[in-house]
Each structure stands twice: as C-alpha cells, then as structure tokens.
A protein has these predicted regions:
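Solvent-exposed, charged helical/coil patches
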Residues: 1-23, 62, 68
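A short acidic/basic microdomain associated with nuclease active sites
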Residues: 23-36
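Conserved beta-strand positions that form and line the central face of beta-propeller blades
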Residues: 32, 69, 109
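Structural motif
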Residues: 37, 48-52, 94, 107
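Conserved catalytic cores of phosphodiester-cleaving nucleases, focusing on short active-site segments
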Residues: 40-61, 78
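Catalytic cores of nucleic-acid endonucleases
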Residues: 57-105
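Short, low-complexity, polybasic intrinsically disordered segments
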Residues: 102, 106-114
Length: 114
C-alpha cells in the first residue's frame, strides 16, 4: 500500500471538494489562490456570494477532526488573502468563509465557518 505525502493528501481532498461543489452548482473561480498573506484552497461563487473555502482532509481522527486544523491564525490568513482577492478583482459583493471537512468518505460542508 502506497502512502501519500501531505501535498498528495491535500490535492486529493481539494479534488473531492471541487467535485462536491460542482455537483451542488457552485462555480469554481480559483483554486490554490496564493499571495504573501496566505493561500485559499478554493474560491467559488453561488447565489450572489463569493465563497472562500478551506479544505481539510483526513482518513481518521487520530489528530482530531479536520476542521480543528483551521486555527484562528489560519482564519486570519484566509481573511487577509480574501481581501487581496476582492481588491485585485475589484469586486463588491457578499462573501463568506466555509470549511469543507473530509473524514474518510464523509464530507461535511460547514457554511459560514468563521
């Protein structure tokens, strides 16, 4: 059995999350949006909202729930990076911050997570 490194695990989780979102009619605008302030896994649009999504994937809860890895520090990074995206794209819209938690085969979409 091959073991995946952290990048491969992250890529797998993000791929699952993108498919999940597309099936629910979200429009994916960006993936892995990076700036000096941080990174946003997925930026999507639905129902007049721009949604900044952090994806956390784990096979088990040995290190806690995936959502617990979205610390206050990580939330601040995502918010600062989202501000950069809004400014760069000259957007004026409602936005929200979601977490997609993937634990094994279970997916939970936590809307307005922070």
């Amino acid at each position: 059995m091959a073991f995946l490194n952290n990048v491969e695990i992250g890529n797998k989780g993000e791929r699952i999350a993108r498919n999940y979102l597309r099936l629910r009619l979200y429009k994916i605008l960006e993936t892995n949006y990076r700036r000096k302030t941080g990174e946003i896994d997925i930026i999507a649009k639905k129902g007049g909202y721009i949604i900044f999504i952090e994806v956390k994937y784990r096979n088990n809860t040995n290190k806690g729930l995936p959502r617990e890895a979205v610390t206050a520090f990580k939330q601040r990074q995502i918010k600062r990076t989202a501000e950069m995206y809004i400014i760069e794209n000259k957007l004026s819209c409602d936005m929200r911050f979601d977490v997609i938690e993937i634990l094994g085969k279970r997916i939970e979409h936590i809307k307005n997570a922070f």
